[in-house]
Regions:
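Terminus-proximal functional modules
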Residues: 1-79
Length: 79
């Protein structure tokens, strides 16, 4: 297989069970590169802003686990 794969995993949390409460990043890990979105993946950053950046830069969300107050999302980008 030629080319490379970038993988971003985000652990997020929200402070309330109210569905529209903003989610914040607890931890993010990157395999490969998250450019140009690396600066949106710090703890405390907005999960929504990170997702919009990733999706706008050819990442595809392949997993979204939502337990209400916390969750995990995985994004991949193929070259």
């Amino acid at each position: 297989m030629s080319g490379s794969v970038d993988v971003v995993t985000i652990l997020w949390e929200r402070t309330s069970l109210i569905p529209l409460t903003q989610r914040t990043i607890v931890q993010a890990s990157v395999i490969g590169s998250a450019a140009p979105c690396k600066n949106t993946l710090d703890p405390g950053d907005s999960y929504r802003a990170a997702v919009l950046c990733l999706l706008g830069n050819r990442f595809v969300q392949v997993l979204n686990l939502d337990s209400g107050l916390s969750g995990v999302a995985v994004f991949i980008r193929l070259f």
